[in-house]
Amino acid sequence: MPVDINRLTDGWLELESDPGLFTLLLEDFGVKGVQVEEIYDLQKTIEGPVFGFIFLFRWIEERRARRKIVETTTEMYVKDEEAVNSIFFAHQVVPNSCATHALLSVLLNCSDIDLGTTLSRLKVHTKGMCPDNKGWAIGNTPELACAHNSHAMPQARRRMDRNSGVSTGRFTGEAFHFVSFCPINGHLFELDGLKPFPMDHGPWGEKEDWTDKFRRVMSDRLGISTDRRIAITHKLKMLRTNQTIVSAALEKLLKSKQLESRSQAEIRETVDKIKKEEQESTVKLSSEYSQLLEMHEKDEPAVAMSKELESLVSLNSSSDSVEIIGETEIKKENPPPSPPPAFIGAGTFSPKDLLSLLKNLESEINITEQHLCDENEKRAMFKVDDCRRTHNYDEFICTFLSMLAYQGELGDLVTQHLVTSRKPSLGGVQNSGSRGVVRNYNKKSTTNGSSPKTPSSKRRRGRTKYRKRK
């Protein structure tokens, strides 16, 4: 059928979210053996093979702007150009075409579907293209545009005509938006034409189907979780408790190190004292033995010598006993220090390790406190937005306009606004919609070279005569 190619990119109409409509649209595309079913429960078992899921949600541009920062930090985009071009991922460059984009994202990434002539040609033609070119290829395919618009409601056509003067683009979105989820090369991919890259949610388990992976992803995204402030507060409490424990352990370890150094110094002093006493006793014994040798040289009687030896032996034994007793007394007076108490367990930590652990805890506490502050601010913004949304501004607007009218400024403001919107541009060109009207102000010359009198001068003269008559 003949189609105006120049009007394809600005003539796509918005479609309703209806499984029957999508199934008929697939038939118009030429696809065989595939239908679309609506799912109300993710946990419900789906019969037959599933080629993909299409997720529908209400599109709000402000919500998308708020999600930009979060998405860039949490979502795993596939940014490799070769990997992106190897799959069918197209940017939505044509407004109101997200329904067709969602269907094509599922169909053209499956190898065991009878695509028909149109989609098979499109798949071959766009192989290896970048996402932007694939988006333009979809928008400039007459069969797709005609099939898409044939299922639109008449209200959609009237809305399109009403908004014909409004600039539409990739980011001035529809009321609803469609996102596709499909398995590609063993990974679950999320394909959204309004995002810069496809999103890889990773592989699924060996003993599960890819639909189970999809259910987990959607449950995490749509599930209602507990208040984050409670979890963050609990985490902050645990971190502060651990900080107190580590600080006490570090202080205890430093004290034990000091006691150990003191005990070692006392032991050294005791050992030195004992050695000194042993040296003194050795000097005393050597002097006594020298006296015995002198007596032996003088050939003293054996009896006297034996007595001296007995006395020496008794003296020696007494000195030994004195040394033993003295050493015992010293040990009693200075008992060895008790071993330092064991710290934490068998594997002890050094003060350096504990100090590093303490710094990490302090850093984690600061981060958690910031998260708690952010959650509190977000909750406060929820309340502010709710107040703005539920507040009735009609009374304020009526009062404001009434005060302007009472002061005589409302009419002037309205007139000024209308004059500004209708003010002609330089060169005599006045905008009238999208058309330009050029007014000719050339003066007509007379035979004597004088210019004709303007109407304004006549009016002024007439007023002057009228004043003179009075």
From Swiss-Prot:
The record marks 192 as: Important for enzyme activity. InterPro entries: Papain-like_cys_pep_sf, Peptidase_C12_UCH, Peptidase_C12_UCH_sf, UCH_C. Its main location: nucleus. Keywords: Chromatin regulator, Coiled coil, Hydrolase, Nucleus, Protease, Thiol protease, Ubl conjugation pathway. Pfam families: Peptidase_C12 (PF01088), UCH_C (PF18031). Residues 11-241 form the UCH catalytic domain. GO terms for cellular component: chromatin; cytoplasm; PR-DUB complex. One of its GO terms (biological process) is protein deubiquitination. One of its GO terms (molecular function) is chromatin binding. It catalyses: Thiol-dependent hydrolysis of ester, thioester, amide, peptide and isopeptide bonds formed by the C-terminal Gly of ubiquitin (a 76-residue protein attached to proteins as an intracellular targeting signal). Residues 260-280 form a coiled coil. Belongs to the peptidase C12 family. BAP1 subfamily. Catalytic component of the polycomb repressive deubiquitinase (PR-DUB) complex, a complex that specifically mediates deubiquitination of histone H2A monoubiquitinated at 'Lys-119' (H2AK118ub1). Mediates bisymmetric organization of the PR-DUB complex and is involved in association with nucleosomes to mediate deubiquitination. Does not deubiquitinate monoubiquitinated histone H2B. Required to maintain the transcriptionally repressive state of homeotic genes throughout development. The PR-DUB complex has weak or no activity toward 'Lys-48'- and 'Lys-63'-linked polyubiquitin chains. Catalytic component of the polycomb repressive deubiquitinase (PR-DUB) complex, at least composed of caly/calypso, Asx and sba (MBD5/6 homolog). The PR-DUB complex associates with nucleosomes to mediate deubiquitination of histone H2AK118ub1 substrates; the association requires the positively charged C-terminal tail of caly, probably due to direct binding of DNA. Interacts (via ULD domain) with Asx (via DEUBAD domain); the interaction produces a stable heterodimer with a composite binding site for ubiquitin. This is Ubiquitin carboxyl-terminal hydrolase calypso. It comes from Culex quinquefasciatus (Southern house mosquito).
